[in-house]
Amino acid sequence: MSPVEESPEEFLARFAAHRVEVRLYPEPWGSPLLEVQTPAGFVYAMDRGAPPAPVGEARVLFHGLARKVARAQGKEGVFREGAAYRLVGTARPLEKGFYLLLARGLPVVVHWEGPMPEEGEVLLWPPLMLFRE
């Protein structure tokens, strides 16, 4: 299996077309976890950018590693389950091993080695990751 990313900068450049406008909220200095207001509501994501994280409007890329993938059973959305997120939405392939899952207006680049249904339900491994410039 090849690495999922070469570097945060390379990953962001590779999938930059799938960034989304969000609002970042202040976190304690040095905290890697960001509180983010997205089109789908608030999420917590691990910041893959250099400190300090900006506050306010930003264009960011969300990325997650899929633990389980199934055909969508519930309503579309982004649901927190402990430290993990369950995404339910529309998926489309980007390149080998990567899909774009759109859940209530929130695009997330998901890594999954197998096939993903067009209407998918994905349980991510924690953490949900956020890439920014």
Cite the ranges covered by each PLM segment.
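Structural detector for short beta-strands of small beta-barrel domains
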Residues: 2-28, 76-97, 122-124
